[in-house]
Regions:
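Aromatic-lined carbohydrate-recognition surfaces of secreted/lumenal glycan-active proteins
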Residues: 7-11, 28-67, 112-123, 157-159
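Surface-exposed cleft-lining segments at the edges of enzyme active sites
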Residues: 17-30, 86-93
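A short acidic (Asp/Glu
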Residues: 18, 64-65, 166-168
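Alpha-helical scaffolding segments of alpha/beta enzyme cores, especially the outer helices
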Residues: 31-45, 68, 72-75, 101-108, ...
Length: 178
């Protein structure tokens, strides 16, 4: 038994990346990318088979606010996981079309890394209640991303909320991304 993967969960600036660009040579995007490169080089030197992944903010302009450039990060990470939490309060207003578009945006921009869409297992209500989803509802969401986007997988957030469906075989007929 050993380590199969390492996930970088909060590899970003907290919405203020544009304030951390003291020169053309030193930028927020450069810092995040360099950290990915250093982690990649250190981990792959020990075990080239370890999967490296990172959670990314879902905004298309994540470079400006968070220092996350999927094109650059995708050179060093195996999987990019945009947090497409479209059932959550902050993103619900954007709707499903936005969510599917985010998955495609990251899949196109983040190559050669694969993209797994980060989806929630719960919904936020207008009264700030967190309501767990049943397995069928979560499966329906996952199926939409499998059938309608370039994403090659999903990540479900958050363990302990919602009923986890059987996702085995969901991507079996979808060609692997190159």
């Amino acid at each position: 038994m050993g380590v199969d993967g390492i996930h970088l969960d909060y590899i970003r600036f907290g919405g203020t990346a544009y304030k951390h660009n003291p020169s053309e040579e030193i930028t927020a995007v450069g810092c995040v990318t360099e950290f990915c490169r250093q982690i990649h080089d250190a981990v792959k030197a020990v075990n080239p088979g370890i999967v490296l992944s990172a959670a990314l903010m879902p905004e298309p302009d994540s470079e400006y606010y968070y220092g996350q450039d999927p094109a650059q990060m995708g050179q060093y990470l195996d999987i990019l996981m945009p947090m497409i939490y479209y059932h959550s309060e902050g993103y619900r207003k954007n709707g499903l079309k936005w969510a599917l578009g985010v998955a495609d945006h990251f899949a196109k921009k983040g190559s050669p890394a694969r993209v797994w869409a980060g989806l929630t297992t719960y919904e936020d209500t207008d009264t700030a209640q967190v309501v767990p989803m049943d397995a069928e509802r979560i499966l329906q969401d996952c199926r939409m991303f499998a059938d309608s986007t370039l994403a090659t997988g999903v990540v479900l957030f958050r363990y302990g909320l919602g009923e986890l469906p059987d996702l085995n075989g969901l991507w079996k007929d979808k060609p692997a991304a190159k």
